[in-house]
Amino acid sequence: MASYNLRSQVRLIAITIVIIITLSTPITTNTSPQPWNILSHNEFAGKLTSSSSSVESAATDFGHVTKIFPSAVLIPSSVEDITDLIKLSFDSQLSFPLAARGHGHSHRGQASAKDGVVVNMRSMVNRDRGIKVSRTCLYVDVDAAWLWIEVLNKTLELGLTPVSWTDYLYLTVGGTLSNGGISGQTFRYGPQITNVLEMDVITGKGEIATCSKDMNSDLFFAVLGGLGQFGIITRARIKLEVAPKRAKWLRFLYIDFSEFTRDQERVISKTDGVDFLEGSIMVDHGPPDNWRSTYYPPSDHLRIASMVKRHRVIYCLEVVKYYDETSQYTVNEEMEELSDSLNHVRGFMYEKDVTYMDFLNRVRTGELNLKSKGQWDVPHPWLNLFVPKTQISKFDDGVFKGIILRNNITSGPVLVYPMNRNKWNDRMSAAIPEEDVFYAVGFLRSAGFDNWEAFDQENMEILKFCEDANMGVIQYLPYHSSQEGWVRHFGPRWNIFVERKYKYDPKMILSPGQNIFQKINSS
């Protein structure tokens, strides 16, 4: 056993050295192959394009703060098209990078492939197939290119639903499973990656494998939250439950951050309480659209604005309880008891009763409104963080009441809500803090093409504050410009991440836009 452990350690050290050398050695453009020249193969005729419109579209994402151009775009009609392309790259002396792109909701070019090939996953969506629901086993098999809203529509037809969601449903299944998939349900049901039973994955060697916690388990756990580094998900089996009919939706306003967080932490500690919990902040210099949604009655807008002006920063707690015919007579009593137990500002409690679908798809209304005003396809210099519970008060003082107020440029929602670590799985690749409770903090900014750099600068100021204060903050939907940043990001799990990369994508072909590894070519 001792000899085995020594050999394992030596192998891991060797792998790490190879990766470090590769990362520190720039690959010049004259050695980088051009996929359009390489892929003059009949099997890709009509499926691979280098048209200016296709390349431009693949270079642009939701973030609109960077453009990274591929040489070509693959428009696959089957999984085999993707497998063949990866095999071709892997077997080539000069391999080319390749990235899967779903709905393009990355914010920093993470789904790009400079001088490589971007795979348009949505081209494989077939309305006549791709989603299969098992009512007896309570799962849905879905092609990874489908959007979560499409999955929801299909499962609701049978009275079933997945239990873990993102706030925005127009994201692909494969995209969120490669990152984590979080929202206000995470504290109770876990992120989307912990609600997966099985997947089909194409590795960086062009091999397709079915994996689960019991079959090819290392690949299964590597891919979930793995930022696309180990394989492209083509199918996922998602857990389902009986769908509720409606949602009792409450919001409470706070002026004291400690009471706000204490109430949040108490609510998420209950095993059978609310189904959804999120928090957010309001600042006195923020645009009214940050909070003047249709949720708050117009008659209260002046009251809320006055409180925001007086306190400069206030906090909103949002909770939801799902119900149906069997619980419709008890849900009001449960929510009334919850309201009485909270330390919110009295007189500032708001309530709505909506359908389950309308609640889950609530962001869509805002999206359509912004699109109608030409304010959707704009820069989104987002920053998403995981902050340990013991550091959240320091974060409030230094960031919410410090950097944010001082810079006076807030635009877009700022979320802050806790999650339970025991709902995550350490075998998966996603990086999270070590504490039992940690907070998701999201600066979901919108900016102009002429001023987004100011928001980006503020993001860097926030990150520097957290680093200088040694807060143990970890980025979600991460972006790091150097290998050192990624080593810090994964911490003690970095060596495992490197070993898995070497195992499943040894030529560093997949997802180069994450900027974690550089590709390795044969000599």
Curated annotation (Swiss-Prot):
**What InterPro entries does its record include?**
Cytok_DH_C_sf, Cytokinin_DH_FAD/cytokin-bd, FAD-bd_PCMH, FAD-bd_PCMH-like_sf, FAD-bd_PCMH_sub1, FAD-bd_PCMH_sub2, FAD-linked_Oxase-like_C, FAD-linked_Oxidoreductases_BP
Annotated Gene Ontology cellular components are: endoplasmic reticulum; vacuole
Q: Tell me where it resides.
A: Endoplasmic reticulum; Vacuole
Annotated residues for binding of FAD = A100, G102, G104, S106, Q110, D167, T172, S178, I182, I233, Y476, S511, Q514
The leader peptide range reads 1-31
Lineage, top-rank taxon, reads Eukaryota
Cofactor(s) needed for function: FAD
- Give the Pfam families listed for this entry: Cytokin-bind, FAD_binding_4
Give the catalytic activity. Answer: N(6)-dimethylallyladenine + A + H2O = 3-methyl-2-butenal + adenine + AH2
Query: FAD-binding PCMH-type domain: from which residue to which, for each copy?
Result: 66-243
UniProt GO BP = cytokinin catabolic process
Q: Kindly list the positions at which Pros-8alpha-FAD histidine occurs in this protein.
A: H105
- Taking the first listed entry, what is the main subcellular location of this protein, grouped into a coarse class? endoplasmic reticulum
UniProt entry tagged with the keyword S-adenosyl-L-methionine: no
Q: What is the name attached to this protein's record?
A: Cytokinin dehydrogenase 3
Q: Which organism is it from?
A: Arabidopsis thaliana (Mouse-ear cress)
Taxonomic path = Eukaryota, Viridiplantae, Streptophyta, Embryophyta, Tracheophyta
**What's the gene?**
CKX3
